[in-house]
């Protein structure tokens, strides 16, 4: 049994299972909890609760477990559409993924799509579990499937030759039938996950960035901007940049307040007010960010991967075409952008996920993996992620 208390002493890593429908993602998730956490049966995981992220409803199951080295938060989704939505909205951030492939079927369409999505949304590392090996009698056939999986991973720019592939049977692990492909395989899988999936950098160790939510003018003191520090640390007296919407400018933080108390610094997760030197109330606005100088730049053109809501999800009722002009909601503000669809894609239907080029009418502080909502008059009609910056 895992300890019930959440021990902060271990490194925390977020992972998830991905792969084709019925290849055994949920069974594997259940099997991992059996040996490394508080056992959750298949039915408990499969009945995933609905949650909302960026105005989109997604069913996601969360389980947690721990190895000797790490504490894991693990996400498993019941349906393919939930995976697409989850990965694009970042509802459950993934530091790495376990790709489940049935040895009996080999890679299938959703295997490919999940690998592509993992690449587009920047999942840093993948470990493979080749499931249902007891259904394949021929060792050569098993080798062939492994080769296919490696080639597919390489095709989408993952290091296919180096990725650990563990062969086993989630069912054998759950039923205690064959230890070598059951329990032993699940334990080996987790030791490979420990070894191969890198420890994420903690937000507080990254470069300072704070999206501006509000701007106030305090007589005799100057201009205060408020927001939640997304990452890094800002200390009183430090020089920072104001990026996005207008030309980038520099200023000094002369004070940091939280809950009406003065602090000497604000850090990732804190809701702060920052007093800025020599900036007037009109010179700064919501939608800009405060950032460590040189760490983030403003851009207007980018490639994105997006999911478009269905009518039932509250989205559009009709398709859209190239030159579609919705608002793109980045962090704290809406910016109008013009969509260009890829060659060969004539239109996008509600419920589709699509790669597209976007050109914003004003620049936004942007980097790859930044997420956004697509809105029409304040109503969310889609969600996306920046896959590549063009200019």
UniProtKB/Swiss-Prot annotation:
Known EC number: 3.6.5.3
Cellular component annotations (GO), alphabetically ordered: cytosol
Catalyses which reaction(s): GTP + H2O = GDP + phosphate + H(+)
Residues engaged in binding GTP: 19-26, 76-80, 131-134
Broad class of enzyme this protein falls into: hydrolase
Annotated GO MF terms: GTP binding; GTPase activity; guanosine tetraphosphate binding; translation elongation factor activity
Keyword annotations from UniProtKB, A to Z: Cytoplasm, Elongation factor, GTP-binding, Hydrolase, Magnesium, Metal-binding, Nucleotide-binding, Protein biosynthesis
Quaternary structure and interacting proteins, as annotated: Monomer.
Purpose: GTP hydrolase that promotes the GTP-dependent binding of aminoacyl-tRNA to the A-site of ribosomes during protein biosynthesis.
Family annotation (NCBIfam families): EF-Tu (TIGR00485), PRK00049.1 (NF000766), PRK12735.1 (NF009372), PRK12736.1 (NF009373), small_GTP (TIGR00231)
Family: Belongs to the TRAFAC class translation factor GTPase superfamily. Classic translation factor GTPase family. EF-Tu/EF-1A subfamily.
Annotated protein name in UniProt: Elongation factor Tu 1
Organism: Bartonella bacilliformis (strain ATCC 35685 / KC583 / Herrer 020/F12,63)
């Amino acid at each position: 049994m895992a300890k019930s208390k959440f021990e902060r002493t271990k490194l925390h890593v977020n992972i998830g299972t991905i792969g084709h429908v019925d290849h055994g993602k949920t069974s594997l998730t259940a099997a991992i909890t059996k040996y490394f956490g508080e056992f959750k049966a298949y039915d408990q995981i499969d009945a995933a609760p609905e949650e909302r992220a960026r105005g989109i409803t997604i069913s996601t199951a969360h389980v947690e477990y721990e190895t000797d080295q790490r504490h894991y938060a693990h996400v498993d989704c019941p349906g393919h559409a939930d995976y697409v939505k989850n990965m694009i909205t970042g509802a459950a951030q993934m530091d790495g993924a376990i790709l489940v492939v049935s040895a009996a079927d080999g890679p299938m369409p959703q295997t490919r799509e999940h690998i592509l999505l993992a690449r587009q949304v920047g999942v840093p590392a993948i470990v493979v579990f080749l499931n249902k090996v007891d259904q394949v009698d021929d060792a050569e056939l098993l080798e062939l499937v492994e080769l296919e999986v490696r080639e597919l991973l390489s095709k989408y720019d993952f290091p296919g030759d180096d990725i650990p592939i563990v062969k086993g049977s989630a069912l054998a692990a759950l039923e205690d039938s064959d230890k070598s492909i059951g329990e032993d395989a699940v334990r080996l899988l987790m030791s490979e996950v420990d070894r191969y999936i890198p420890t994420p950098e903690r937000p507080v160790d990254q470069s300072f960035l704070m999206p501006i939510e509000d701007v106030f003018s305090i007589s005799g003191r100057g201009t205060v901007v408020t927001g939640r520090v997304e990452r890094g640390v800002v200390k009183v007296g430090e020089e920072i940049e104001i990026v996005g919407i207008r030309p980038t400018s520099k200023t000094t933080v002369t004070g940091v307040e939280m809950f009406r108390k003065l602090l000497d610094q604000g850090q990732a997760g804190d809701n702060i007010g920052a007093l800025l030197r020599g900036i007037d109330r009109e010179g700064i606005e919501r939608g800009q960010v405060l950032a460590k100088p040189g760490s983030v730049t403003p851009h207007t053109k980018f490639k994105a991967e997006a999911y478009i809501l269905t009518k039932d999800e509250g989205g559009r009722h009709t398709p859209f075409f190239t030159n579609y002009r919705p608002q793109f909601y980045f962090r704290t503000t809406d910016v109008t952008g013009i969509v260009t669809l890829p060659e060969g894609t004539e239109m996008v239907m509600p419920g589709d996920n699509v790669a597209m080029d976007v050109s914003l009418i004003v620049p936004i502080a942007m980097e790859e993996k930044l997420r956004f909502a697509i809105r029409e008059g304040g109503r969310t009609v889609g969600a996306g992620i920046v896959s590549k910056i063009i200019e």
